[in-house]
């Protein structure tokens, strides 16, 4: 036996789960993903999502509705006659007609330990908040925002220097295994559900460009968490003068350092920067239009003398 599944996902994060369900022996009736988006150097080429590309390689039918407001779109979903829908970072709101459009409902893979970090950016927010652990949860979806009962949890430790990109990859693999395990249990009616607690609800708002600038007036631990929580995308940044002009420099890696000076002052020739309390050492940087590079390589092309005061951050 196996389950017949409608898979719904869009980014690279979703692809291992799709493959894991197939490897577990389940039948994928169809794949739903977001429509192709303009891409390429001039934005003239339509680029299919990573899930779309993977589904085509696997020989699976792909649907790309803009939304599910159309009755014909809802009817097509129901007529697939699937046992269950699996949703991983799909990116579209699902109406009640879709949530109830399969025999067993919709199950979502969410990258946090719910109810902490409900919403769009749980990976980044967990690191930015200094959390020591997070995880992947499989939950049965309801009409709320990540409010459904939990079926399975897999915790993941967050290392002190781990970036959002590194945590993304770790959770991506953990989530693939967790969803396959959950569907195997669901097939035999062995997947109990537990309601989320009412306490501890925190929302993971989408990252806004306005919050990406580094504020060195904050404690060093907060600055360090800010940098690694936004690495590699969209990237935390500060402004400095290069060749007589102010330029943004992204910081993609950092570590805690020692030292107390004026806020934003460069303490040493290895880019240790004084913060509101303590200091951070910038270890990986990227100039506008350039490639990421180690601090030593950055400094060879752009010397920064000890005693230099960098822009402090938001004003």
UniProtKB/Swiss-Prot annotation:
Q: Which gene encodes it?
A: fmt
Is this entry keyworded Amino-acid biosynthesis?
no
Question: Is Transferase among the key words of this record?
Answer: yes
EC number of the protein: 2.1.2.9
Which protein is depicted? Methionyl-tRNA formyltransferase
What's a single GO CC term here?
A: cytosol
Keywords noted in UniProt: Protein biosynthesis, Transferase
Native source organism of the sequence: Rhizobium rhizogenes (strain K84 / ATCC BAA-868)
State where (6S)-5,6,7,8-tetrahydrofolate binds.
112-115
The family note in this entry says:
Belongs to the Fmt family.
Q: What does this protein do?
A: Attaches a formyl group to the free amino group of methionyl-tRNA(fMet). The formyl group appears to play a dual role in the initiator identity of N-formylmethionyl-tRNA by promoting its recognition by IF2 and preventing the misappropriation of this tRNA by the elongation apparatus.
Its lineage opens with: Bacteria, Pseudomonadati, Pseudomonadota, Alphaproteobacteria, Hyphomicrobiales
């Amino acid at each position: 036996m196996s389950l017949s599944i409608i898979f719904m996902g869009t980014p690279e994060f979703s692809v291992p789960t799709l493959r894991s369900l197939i490897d577990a022996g389940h039948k994928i009736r169809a794949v739903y993903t977001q429509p192709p988006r303009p891409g390429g150097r001039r934005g003239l080429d339509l680029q299919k999502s990573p899930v779309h590309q993977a589904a085509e390689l696997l020989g699976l039918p792909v649907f790309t509705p803009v939304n599910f407001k159309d009755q014909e779109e809802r009817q097509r979903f129901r007529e697939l006659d699937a046992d269950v829908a699996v949703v991983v970072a799909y990116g579209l709101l699902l109406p009640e007609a879709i949530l109830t459009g399969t025999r067993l409902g919709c199950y979502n893979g969410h990258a946090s330990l719910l109810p902490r970090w409900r919403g769009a950016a749980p990976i980044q927010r967990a690191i930015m908040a200094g959390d020591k652990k997070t995880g992947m949860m499989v939950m049965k979806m309801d009409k709320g925002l990540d409010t459904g009962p939990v079926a399975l949890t897999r915790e993941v430790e967050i290392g002190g220097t781990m970036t959002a990109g590194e945590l993304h990859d770790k959770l991506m693999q953990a989530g693939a295994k967790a969803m396959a395990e959950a569907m195997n249990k669901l097939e035999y009616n062995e997947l109990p559900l537990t309601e989320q607690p009412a306490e501890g609800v925190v929302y993971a708002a989408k990252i806004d460009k306005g919050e990406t600038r580094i504020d060195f007036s904050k404690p060093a631990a907060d600055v360090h968490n800010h940098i690694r929580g936004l690495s590699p995308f969209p990237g935390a940044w500060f402004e400095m003068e290069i060749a007589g002009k102010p330029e943004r420099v992204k910081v993609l890696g950092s570590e805690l350092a020692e030292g107390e000076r004026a806020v934003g002052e460069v303490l040493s020739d290895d880019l240790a920067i004084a913060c509101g309390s303590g200091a951070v050492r910038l270890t990986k940087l990227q100039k506008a239009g350039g490639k990421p590079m180690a601090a030593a390589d950055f400094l060879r092309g752009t010397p920064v003398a000890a005693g230099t005061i960098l822009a402090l951050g938001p004003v």
